[in-house]
Design a protein with these regions (language model features):
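N-terminal leader/linker segments that initiate helical-solenoid repeat arrays
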Residues: 17-74, 80, 88-89, 100-101, ...
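Alpha-helical adaptor scaffolds
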Residues: 79, 179, 338, 342-345, ...
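Structural motif corresponding to the intra-repeat A-B loop/turn of tetratricopeptide repeats
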Residues: 47, 81, 116, 154, ...
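Generic helix N-cap/helix-start motif at coil->alpha-helix transitions
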Residues: 29-37, 64-71, 98-108, 121, ...
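Alpha-helical repeat scaffolds
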Residues: 54, 58, 84-97, 119-133, ...
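Residue-level recognition of tetratricopeptide repeat
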Residues: 42, 76, 111, 149, ...
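Terminal, low-structured helical/coil segments at or just beyond the last alpha-helical repeat
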Residues: 255-257, 261-265, 510, 515, ...
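Sec-dependent signal peptide recognition
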Residues: 3-11
Length: 561
């Protein structure tokens, strides 16, 4: 409460010192209620409670013509609440046009112009937006890329003198060629999808869409047939399902290269993903809502909104977004069920979450392997290893020995056996996994760690750990393992170097903190050791068995030390 009061006082000082809205110039234009609502809105806005922020901003709309900061926040809040059309109207209907001079305002006006097929206006607004190109990291990319798109839409050709933004520009060129019906469009799709500099698998959907739109059905079937349900994204799994069931028209219902709004919508979705990857979920949702405004038919993109809200623990909003996914599109419906189960786990615990998921799963007549895989992972995370093993076994028996997915499933099942103490079965699965994929750092790490804990094949375990570390030297779990290996052979100085790094990378991991405490104790740094053991007790996800052991160590120290 005190912090909120400080924020209000600071905001008041700024507010009265703003030339556009000074006390002497315009204090009589509003009343104390406007001020109260405005500053309440600021507090809600700063606390990322956008729904409340918008409620307070709506109650003080008299300020939209008088205070630049207010207008920016009000417009931003409107878009976050998916009221894009209202946000556009607020900007367009301002008496004072000077206070609409900010980046998001121009992007909204561009979106409005595209919606109305007014490419000339869109170009004018994009030119204006460039004055803010250095204000935020992605502003230049957004303005320049939109400029290239609008040029193609307006002039029916590709802009020759343009800025290059690497692979982002390759994506833009691909869609521009698709829109202009260039003969080499297919080659651009193939080159992008096979690009080794990143994961561009999403664009397989758009390639299939392009093939269907151009009546190349057999080629579309061939591409879809190469997709594996179990390791494909939701969008690609749904695409393969549509192809297998002859639902070719579904593709054009949600996207068409002939529609400029659909193309720009996809670009804005890409921007949203960029922000989401940096944990900037508000800006991600801002651009995602603009994307949805231009192409409301691509409801599958709302899965990113649901993920963003989930990461912010806004579960009520997640539930609302999930209502967009129904049983007709089975993979997105399954995404909905999983996300609902995850929220139940967060709110009520694993037992209730697993019960909900298994009940929904059992009602599915012919569950896909991807669904079986997901429920197996849920059971494994819930420490219900027997159930997890049963589901993993169902999938493993259906896969070829050459399949990389079989290697991964054997690794997961082997880990489940290890947790149950069935080391013979665990070793069998993990070794089988490594025969398929000898360079899998995680399988190497898991098996080596298990052997070290059992004081079994120490030299071979060390060799496996060194191989895993060479492949994944920045992975904190592998760093922890190799550090713990040195601990187990009494090389505490070397062990400390690795565990210190692991703690720096995973400061809230109970096992890593526990290990580091043990090593510090052996190095006679006992005060520091107890500090890290106490850390373990402060973590919400620390197992009860670990807590009991830590409490003993804090009192008695390490035995035999």
């Amino acid at each position: 409460m005190f912090n909120k009061l400080i924020k209000i006082l600071v905001a008041l000082v700024i507010f009265y010192q703003t030339p556009v809205y000074s006390k002497s110039a315009s204090f009589n234009d509003f009343n104390s209620r406007d001020l109260t609502n405005y500053f309440s809105g600021i507090i809600a806005y700063e606390n990322k409670d956008n729904t409340d922020a918008l409620k307070f901003f709506n109650a003080s709309k008299v300020l939209t013509n008088k205070h630049d900061i207010y207008l920016k926040r009000y417009v931003y809040s409107l878009v976050l609440e998916n009221k894009v059309a209202q946000a556009i109207n607020v900007i367009k209907n301002r008496n004072n046009k000077d206070n609409t001079d900010f980046f998001n305002a121009y992007i909204l006006l561009v979106v409005d112009s595209l919606k109305k097929n007014d490419f000339k206006k869109a170009e004018e607004y994009l030119t204006q937006s460039l004055k803010f190109k250095n204000q935020r990291r992605f502003n230049l990319i957004i303005s320049e890329t939109l400029k290239q798109y609008v040029y193609s839409f307006k002039n029916k050709k590709i802009l020759s003198n343009k800025q290059n933004f690497g692979n982002l520009s390759l994506i833009s060129q691909m869609f521009q060629r698709c829109y202009l019906k260039k003969s080499n469009t297919g080659s651009f799709f193939v080159n992008l999808i096979n690009n080794q500099q990143g994961d561009y698998s999403r664009y397989i959907f758009f390639y299939i869409n392009y093939l269907i739109e151009n009546k190349k059905i057999e080629k579309a079937k061939e591409i879809a047939g190469q997709l594996e349900y179990i390791n494909s994204t939701l969008l690609l799994s749904q695409s393969r399902s549509w192809i297998e069931n002859g639902k070719f028209k579904e593709f054009n219902k949600i996207f068409s290269c002939n529609n400029h709004n659909d193309i720009v919508s996809e670009f804005l979705f890409l921007v949203s993903n960029l922000y989401s990857s940096q944990d900037d979920f508000e800006n991600s949702n801002f651009y995602l809502n603009l994307s949805n405004y231009l192409n409301p038919n691509f409801t599958f993109n709302l899965s990113l909104v649901a993920e963003n809200f989930y990461m912010n623990k806004e579960y009520t909003k997640v539930k609302e977004v999930l209502k967009n996914f129904n049983k007709e599109d089975e993979f997105y419906y399954w995404f909905r069920v999983k996300k609902e189960a995850q929220m139940i786990i967060k709110e009520d615990g694993y037992e209730d979450g697993i019960d909900y998921l298994s009940t929904k799963f059992n009602k599915i007549k012919n569950p896909n392997l991807k669904m079986v895989f997901d429920i197996a992972n849920f059971y494994k995370n819930a420490k219900k290893y027997e159930e997890a093993i049963d589901y993993y076994t169902q999938i493993i028996s259906s896969l070829s020995d050459k399949s990389d997915m079989k290697s991964d499933l054997l690794y997961r099942r082997g880990g489940s056996y290890e947790r149950m103490g069935n080391y013979e079965k665990s070793d069998e699965d993990l070794l089988h996994s490594l025969r398929i994929n000898p360079d899998d750092a995680y399988a190497l790490n898991y098996l080596a760690y298990s052997w070290l804990e059992r004081d079994y094949k120490i030299d071979e375990a060390f060799q496996m750990l060194e191989k895993a570390y060479a492949a994944k030297s920045e992975d904190p779990y592998i760093i922890d393992s190799i550090g713990w290996a040195y601990y187990l052979i009494d090389n505490y100085v070397e062990a400390e170097k690795y565990l210190k790094r692991a703690v720096e990378l995973m400061p809230e991991d109970p096992i890593v903190n526990d290990h580091y405490g043990d090593i510090l104790w052996k190095l006679n740094r006992k005060i520091q050791a107890r500090y890290f053991w106490n850390n373990v007790l402060s973590f919400d996800d620390t197992d009860e068995d670990i807590r009991k052991n830590i409490n003993i160590k804090i009192i008695e120290g390490l035995k035999n030390s």
